[in-house]
Every structure is written in C-alpha cells, then in structure tokens.
C-alpha cells in the first residue's frame, strides 16, 4: 500500500453533535408500528455531517475497511466562565471533557455520525458504515476559538 492510498481523510463538521438513540413509535399503519428517531436533533446533525463531507471530500465512496477517529466538540456553559470583568475568562476549575448525560453517550454520537458518512444514509464518504472496523473517539468542550461540531479522520485500512 502506498502512502497516497493510506492518506487520512480529514473532515471538519460544524454544528451541534447529536446522539442517535433508540427508535420511538410514531404511529401505526395496518397494525404495523412506524418508527422514527427519538431525538429531533439527530437529523440536523446528519445533514451537517453529510454537507461537510460533500464539501471537503471529492473522491469516490470508500468500499474498504476504515478506521474512524472522532472528536466531538460542545459549547461551554456560562458557568465555566467568570462573572463581571472576568466574564470572558475561563475558570481554572472548568473541565476539559464533557461528561453530561444531556449531550449523549459517546457510542450514540459515533452512531449518528457514521450514518451521516455512509451512502446508505445519504452520505458520500463510505459505501456503508459497517466498513468502520476501528474507532477512537472523545467528546470535549470547545477551546477558545473553536466552534461546536466534530473533527473526523477516516483512514483506509486496506
């Protein structure tokens, strides 16, 4: 495998990362349940992932095993900053990593993002998200100058 074949594909996604949770019953048709996403935030996040991929990757969809490295970025709450004249300064006690239940489990963030990369869900980077055979991910608060979203690196393994 040449260096060019092994080149990492880097995508910067801007938006609010949303976890893909369980499906919820939306109604019934002829006795069959109609399922939909339990979170309304998943669809906009997938659109953000698809748009970023379409704008930043122009190659053919990958059909080989890949590794996905993802860093999810979330806006910091006001409580992480000082007050008064220190309102723009980050408190020393402010955490770097996000552990809030409100923003979702890391595995569910990966699931929604991987779907946005795959052709089967309207993406353009992967033939199917089942091609992701290795994952490394973290979720953290934005640092100064960063906007919410994700840094994604996809590496061909074949």
Locations of regions flagged by a protein language model:
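Acidic, proline/glycine-enriched N-terminal capping motif
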Residues: 1-158
